[in-house]
Amino acid sequence: DKRVISSVSRCLNPYEEEGFKQMMDVAASDDLEIIVSNTTEAGIVYDPACKLEDVPASSFPGKLTQVLYHRYKAGKKGILMLACELIDNNGKELLKCVNQYIDQWGLDDGFRKYVNEDCTFCGSLVDRIVPGRIRDPKEVAELEQKHGYADPLLDVGEVFGVWVIEGDTK
C-alpha cells in the first residue's frame, strides 16, 4: 500500500553551511512543535569534544542543544521531544545529555529552566521494521511512473508497527 506522509516538508543537511543555517531557521520557527529522534541506540551519547560554536556539534544531543538554545534565544515556546532510540529511558537519557552540554558550555540558568520545564522529553518504545530506502533503481523508476512523481524520501516498512510514548501530563 502507498501512504503519502505530507507532514515532511524537506530534508536539511546540517553538515553543509546552508543546511545548518536552515536548521537554525526552523529552530526559531513558530511552526516547530515536535522533534522526533531516531539516531540508533548509539546516538544518545554525551561527547565532551562538542562545542556550542561547532557547525554542527558532532553528537546528536549536541546538535539538539544548539537547536534548543537558538530557539530559546529567539523567545519561542518549548518543544515536545520524542526519542525513539532503542535504549532504556531514551527521553531521560537525551535530556541528561542536553543538561551536560548546558553545564559544559556555561549556558544560562534561564535556558536550563526552559529545557527542563518548557520542553517535554518523552521516552518511547518503537516496534516496526523499516529496512530503508529501495535500492533497486528499476523498482524506484516503476514506482515513480506509477505514482506520477519522484520521491527522494521513498522508504518501505513492515505493515505491523507500535509506538508507545511515555510522558507527563503536559
Predicted features along the sequence, with ranges:
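Substrate/ligand-engaging "lid" and interaction regions
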Residues: 1-170
